[in-house]
Swiss-Prot record:
SUPFAM superfamilies hit by this protein: Pectin lyase-like (SSF51126)
Protein name: Depolymerase, capsule K63-specific
Subcellular location: Virion
Domain of life: Viruses
InterPro entries reported for this sequence: Pectin_lyase_fold/virulence (IPR011050)
Note: Does not affect the antibiotic susceptibility of Klebsiella strains. Exposure to the depolymerase of the phage induces mutations in the cps (capsule) locus of the host bacterial population.
pH behavior: Optimum pH is 4-7.
Thermal properties of activity per the entry: Optimum temperature is 20-37 degrees Celsius.
Disordered: annotated span: 137-161
Keywords, ordered alphabetically: Degradation of host capsule during virus entry, Degradation of host cell envelope components during virus entry, Host-virus interaction, Viral attachment to host adhesion receptor, Viral attachment to host cell, Viral tail fiber protein, Viral tail protein, Virion, Virus entry into host cell
Family of the protein in this entry: In the N-terminal section; belongs to the Webervirus depolymerase family.
Native source organism of the sequence: Klebsiella phage KP36 (Bacteriophage KP36)
Assembly notes: Homotrimer.
Main localization of the protein described in the UniProt heading: virion
Length: 883
């Protein structure tokens, strides 16, 4: 690879490159648009030549707005390695010497570089002719009589030089494959350029020039991946060999990798698609040494968790990490990530200092202010708490960034929210070891995104994060969003087939949000009896837009339980349950016991949650105070909709003690199949139920609570309410085959009504397409529908949430009012690699509801009888909240 590096160069933000001591327009510079200019600054900056304006000015592009002070530089004349580029270089060189006949000696020096015996003879001839020309010129000066002779001799020398030049070109042409220029000009000429074969060999090559550049073919010899371009940094004698971006030679010299963008884990020796190779140490090395790392869409196998450093972006770009740790290796051995390394058990031995705080203030007085610096994360914890499974869990915990420090007083980025006695410690404790003998640390300001994961274990577990984002993670693992002490962090677009739990935000997790979460239970069942549990000193956590899908093999006793959290919100979700033996949504507090003090449950809200049960359920919504000192305040169940068989115990249940009533609950719960309302030691609650519910001791309940029950019986319209009792296996192979039809008689529907249909099932086989359609008959007789279309290769679990509503529209031609129906659906197709989510809609005019029947149909068929298509769940309900 040819280089031009004469003089020095600087670059402005607009891409103007200014040279000092440069001759960029010189004919022999060979600098053309498209060449790469590399500034040997720190860090290295690169740009592309757009136009050579003058000997000292170049216009560059793709500069990323970088500003570079005057420094050493190199222009990579890489185009010389292509056929066209090499031809252009040779042509420019020959044209130059044709125009410089008075400096033949320079031409001689140029062609001396070609290693041919005959060329040496020609060079000697040129030298002799040049000397003859000089002698003739001297003779002319000495004698007027000899002038003509000298002139003739000079002309002969000129002609001889031209002949020599032409002979050199002929030698090049005649040399064929023996010519270096011809060899390099071949389509595969680049292979003849000397390059280092692998990283191991690079360690044996000692650089001889400052900022020398070398090309490495591959990380491992023969694999053709992980190579790159390195440069010699003569000013560095201390950086350790990190196995990827800094390679130290046997003589102690540093080769530095030239990196553009996120570091590829290939550059640190990771091997894609090799199940026999543990890439974890190599990925870890890349993350430990760079703040932007990527899998670049490739798949790797790891034998241990990846410990995520702070202030780092790890972007899989669609790549995959699969654990190869044996399932017998123990808790967290098969985890994919460890963003932080925390557990209360490891914190007990860490020294802490007294912290004087004021409720609502961000100023803290520390007994020893030297434990933190500005920018550090401080860990505040109460001296009171509870023993949980043998280790101490503080009643209050807060992670905060230190914004300022004056003497013993620090200011943090949020107010203290407790009046308890607090102690403080730096959140990072490199001198103390946690799980797997790794330092106890908190991951700060990092991003993990666009990665598929596959493990039998939790994909993240013994964590501690502050301002960390997990985005677009999918695959299979023991849990969906699980771990310790997630603070000011975000999980978004997480889609996991799980075998244990959906979520546990434990040990003081606070200000953490879960958004667009899809949790699909493993077909093999679940290991946990509570799949979603928020407990142990958490606060201000939210899950928004979620779907929990539990199959017939996944029957936990409790789906969602909140205990020991406050200011938490669970909203905009769908829960699909086969059988449930305890409760689906619950808030529970167990008070102070001999084990210690548990945090209060305060301000817990469930909002816009739809629950679909195909088998049986016990309690849908539950509030429970187990002890006289249990604290539960400000609980709300807003717009909770239940679809399924009548719960065996209660649609809503509230239980306190004689000395500690359940108070302050607000509930708005609907169930078209009804259910019991069980109130035990409960008062001063505002409760609204819709459906054929029953209330034990109605008079007593109404006397102690604000109670409203809405059950508008319209038998003709509700006669179609339907719950499928068993799986329907579709056998039809005829297109548009009707599996189920619901006819609403004329006059039974109103303009404000909504028909909701929830379906679920599965597809199998890979021969033909499988189709499920839900729709209605329009006034033109056409079927208007939304559709599940499973490809031949799809073998999935699927759900359809369909809603049909009515509205009055104006005919654009007649300007008359007419009735239209709109059907919308939310479709989820889940498989072992995640879930695909989509929505669809159809709108059509229908006949007058007062005069004509309204027909809803479910159509299902498959192209090939050998394939499988089942409807395991079908619930149709008329939403009827008008008088």
């Amino acid at each position: 690879m040819a280089l031009y590096r004469e003089g020095k160069a600087a670059m402005a933000a607009d891409g103007t490159v200014t040279g000092t001591g440069t001759k960029w327009q010189s004919s022999l510079s060979l600098i053309r648009p498209g060449a790469t200019i590399m500034f040997l600054s720190s860090p290295i900056q690169m740009a592309v030549v757009n136009k050579v304006v003058s000997d000292t000015e170049i216009k560059a592009i793709t500069t990323n707005g970088a500003v570079v002070a005057s420094s050493d530089y190199a222009i990579l004349l890489s185009d010389s390695l292509t056929v066209d580029g090499l031809a252009q270089d040779v042509a420019e060189t020959l044209r130059y010497y044709q125009s410089q006949e008075t400096v033949i000696a320079d031409a001689v020096e140029f062609f001396k570089n070609f290693d041919f015996d005959s060329l040496q003879d020609l060079a000697n001839q040129i030298n002799a002719d040049s000397e003859s020309a000089q002698s003739s010129a001297a003779a002319a000066a000495a004698s007027e009589n000899a002038a003509k002779t000298s002139e003739n001799n000079a002309k002969s020398s000129e002609v001889a030089a031209e002949n020599a030049r032409d002979q050199v070109q002929q030698i090049i042409n005649d040399a064929g494959d023996a010519s270096t220029l011809v060899v390099l000009a071949n389509p595969d000429g680049f292979r003849h350029i000397g390059r280092c074969k692998d990283i191991a060999t690079l360690r044996t090559i000692e650089p001889v020039e400052s900022r020398q550049v070398i090309e490495v073919l591959s990380y491992y010899n023969g694999l053709a991946q992980g190579g790159g371009t390195f440069w010699y940094d003569p000013n560095d004698s201390v950086t350790e060999d990190n196995g990827g971006s800094c390679i130290v030679t046997n003589g102690g010299k540093r080769w530095k990798r030239i990196i553009d963008g996120a570091v590829d884990v290939l550059s640190f020796g990771a091997k894609p698609d090799d199940i026999s190779f543990d890439s974890a140490p190599h990925i870890q090395a890349a993350l430990d040494n760079h703040d932007a790392v990527s899998l670049y869409g490739r798949s790797y196998y790891i034998g241990s968790p990846i410990y995520m450093p702070s202030r780092t972006v790890f972007d899989g770009m669609g790549g995959k990490l699969t654990s190869i740790a044996p399932s017998t290796a123990g808790f967290m051995a098969g985890s994919i990530f460890a963003p932080g390394n925390y557990h209360p058990d490891f914190w007990e031995e860490v020294p802490k200092v007294a912290a004087t705080t004021t409720l609502g203030s961000a100023n803290i007085t520390l007994a020893d202010p030297n434990i933190v610096n500005v920018g550090d994360i401080i860990r505040l914890s109460s001296t009171t708490g509870v023993l949980s499974a043998g280790f101490f869990v503080s009643e209050y915990l807060q992670m905060a960034r230190v914004l300022s420090k004056t003497g013993n007083v620090i200011t943090i980025d949020g107010p203290v929210e407790s009046q308890l006695t607090l102690v403080a410690a730096n959140a990072n404790q490199p001198g103390y070891l946690a799980r797997f003998n790794k330092p106890l640390f908190c991951c700060v300001d990092s991003i993990i995104q666009n990665i598929e994961i596959d493990t039998w274990d939790y994909w993240t577990a013994d964590s501690a994060t502050y301002n960390v984002k997990f985005s677009n993670i999918w695959g299979s693992a023991k849990a969906v969003a699980y771990g310790n002490t997630f603070c000011r962090s975000l999980f978004e677009d997480i889609r996991i087939v799980f075998s244990g739990r959906v979520s546990e935000l434990a040990f003081g997790s606070h200000d953490t949000n879960l958004v667009r979460i899809t949790a699909i239970a493993s077909p093999k069942g679940l290991s946990a009896s509570v799949v979603f549990g928020w407990a142990e000193s958490g606060r201000r956590c939210t899950i928004d837009t979620f779907s929990i899908m539990l199959n017939a093999n996944a029957n936990p006793s409790t789906v969602i339980r909140v205990s020991g959290h406050r200011d938490s919100l669970i909203k905009n979700g769908s829960i699909y349950v086969h059988n449930n033996t305890n409760n689906i949504l619950s808030v529970e507090n167990y008070g102070t016991t001999a084990d210690g003090v548990r945090p209060d449950c305060d301000n817990i809200t469930f909002e816009n949650v739809s629950i679909f049960v195909t088998g049986s359920s016990a309690v849908v919504c539950d509030v429970y105070k187990s002890a006289d000192n249990s604290v539960i305040k400000n609980v709300a169940f807003k717009n909770i909709k239940y679809f399924g068989p009548t719960p065996s115990v209660a649609l809503y249940r509230a239980r306190g003690t004689l000395a500690n009533f359940v108070k302050g609950v607000q509930a708005n719960i609907s169930s078209d199949t009804g259910g019991a309302i069980v109130l035990s030691n409960s008062e001063n609650n505002v409760l609204t139920f819709t459906g054929p519910v029953s209330v034990t001791s109605l008079v007593s309940a109404a006397a102690k609570n604000t109670l409203s029950i809405r059950n508008y019986a319209r038998s003709s319209a509700k006669a179609n309410n339907f719950t499928q009792e068993s799986t329907l296996n579709v056998t039809d192979t005829t297109a548009n085959a009707v599996s189920k039809e619901f006819t609403y008689p004329a006059g039974s529907l109103r303009i404000n009504d909504k028909i909701k249909l929830s379906l679920g099932g599965s597809t199998a086989g890979t021969v033909g397409k499988k189709t499920v359609q839900v729709g209605f008959i329009g006034s033109d007789g056409a079927f208007k529908y939304v559709e599940l279309a499973a490809l031949a290769t799809d073998q999935v679990y699927w759900t359809m949430e369909v809603e049909i509503s009515f509205l009055r529209t104006t005919n654009s031609q007649t300007n008359e009012l007419e009735t239209s129906a709109i059907i919308t659906s939310f479709l989820s197709k889940g498989a072992a690699t995640g879930a695909a989510l989509s929505g669809s809609r159809a709108l059509a005019v229908v006949s007058d509801l007062a005069l004509s029947n309204f027909v809803v149909q479910v159509r299902a068929w498959k192209e090939n009888a050998a394939d499988g298509l089942s409807l395991s769940r079908m619930n149709l309900q008329l939403e009827d909240l008008t008088a």
